[in-house]
C-alpha cells in the first residue's frame, strides 16, 4: 500500500513502484542538497584528546561540556551529525582516526548512534557511550563528569 499522487491510499503496483523510485531519487540527491552533514568544532590541526559525537538535542550540552573540558587543558573536538542517511562516513572517519577517546552522547538506552557509527565506518575504532534515557535532556555537567570518568 502506498499513497497516490493525490495522497489517497492505493494498492496499484505501478503507483507503488513510481512512489518508491521518487523516494530513492530524493535519497540519492540528499548529499548534494545537504552540504554539511557533520558540524564540527575544535582543533583541526592535530589529534584530539576527546571527540564528542552527538545529534539532535545533545548539541548545546556537548558544546558547553567541551568548553569546560578545554578549560581543563584537554584538546576536545565535537562532531554533531545532522544527517544519518546516507551516513556521512567520509566526513566522520578522519575525525575518528585523529581522536584518542571517542565518546558518543545519546538520549537512549541502547547506544543506537554508536552502533550505526560502528556499522558505517571501519568498526575498529573504540567508541564509548554516554547514555541517558530518563526522558530528560543532558546537562553539560553530566557530560563533563562522565567524560572525566571515562578518559
What are the residue ranges of the model-derived segments?
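Flexible, low-complexity linker and terminal segments
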Residues: 1-151
Amino acid at each position: 500500500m502506498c499513497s497516490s499522487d493525490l495522497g489517497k491510499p492505493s494498492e496499484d503496483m505501478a503507483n507503488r513502484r513510481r512512489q518508491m523510485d521518487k523516494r530513492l531519487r530524493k535519497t540519492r540527491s540528499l548529499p548534494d542538497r545537504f552540504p554539511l552533514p557533520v558540524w564540527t568544532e575544535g582543533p583541526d590541526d592535530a589529534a584530539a584528546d576527546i571527540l564528542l559525537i552527538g545529534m539532535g538535542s545533545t548539541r548545546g550540552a556537548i558544546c558547553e561540556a567541551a568548553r569546560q573540558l578545554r578549560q581543563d587543558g584537554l584538546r576536545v573536538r565535537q562532531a554533531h551529525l545532522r544527517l544519518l542517511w546516507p551516513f556521512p562516513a567520509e566526513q566522520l572517519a578522519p575525525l575518528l582516526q585523529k581522536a584518542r577517546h571517542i565518546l558518543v552522547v545519546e538520549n537512549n538506552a541502547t547506544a543506537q548512534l554508536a552502533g550505526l557509527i560502528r556499522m558505517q565506518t571501519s568498526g575498529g575504532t573504540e567508541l564509548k557511550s554516554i547514555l541517558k534515557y530518563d526522558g530528560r535532556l543532558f546537562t553539560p555537567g553530566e557530560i563533563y563528569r562522565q567524560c572525566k570518568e571515562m578518559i
